[in-house]
Amino acid sequence: MQRNLPAGPRPKDVYFFATCLVDLFCPEAGMDAIQLLEREGITVHFPENQTCCGQPAYTSGYADEARAVAKAQLDLFPENWPVVVPSGSCAGMMRHHYPKLFAEDPMLKAKAENLAERVFELSEFLLKVLNVKWKDSGKPTKVTLHTSCSARREMGTHLHARELLAQLDGVEVLQQSHESECCGFGGTFSVRQPAISGAMASDKADALKETGADAFLSADGGCLMNINGTLEKRRDSFRGQHLASFLWERTGGSGGKNGKGEKA
């Protein structure tokens, strides 16, 4: 999926939209994402009044409620800086659906379109805007990937994680048999249709584990929560990790090295 990338020199400042699920269930992934950006020389700005992007209400058919939530976000990013989001689902909501929510209000639609053009999913920003080049500082490991439906079908960022992982010599990425299938989370779908969601999550967990990987990676907190929850119910030790945390750890983030595999 083609989109306009920032022209001119590398951005020096970005906004960070954490997402509800990262904030509440895997805050370490948010911190690791911020550290990945800061290590590249980026100043990260975190608007403290940010809330939900409105996606659960929107996909449940509550357009008015989603519009109210989205409207509250429009004024949080006044500078013309990129907005980096560690979730394909939330990034997809902000980029593709915010302008639709305000289609009948020219002023708000213009603000939504301006914001939408600046929204980047984390791996997209690292790869396509910052053009990061990393060295691996971890032990050999095998992983498999789960990409969210929004990353694949809305954002077109489903291959970016693979490209980033390909820079890491000690990481082997194994292909799963249900690569393009949903994990069953789907915002409120997992609550409204728990039996169907549970069956989908079970199939996905099976496909990921059957690869023989040491762990699975995903760039979406909802998918991680759903699949890891299924594995937890089974008392299975196989687990998933957010892509941001894995990249931070593998490129020396927790070992006192810079991103080039050298002592800082």
Predicted regions and their residues:
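Iron-sulfur cluster-binding electron-transfer modules in prokaryotic oxidoreductases
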Residues: 1-264
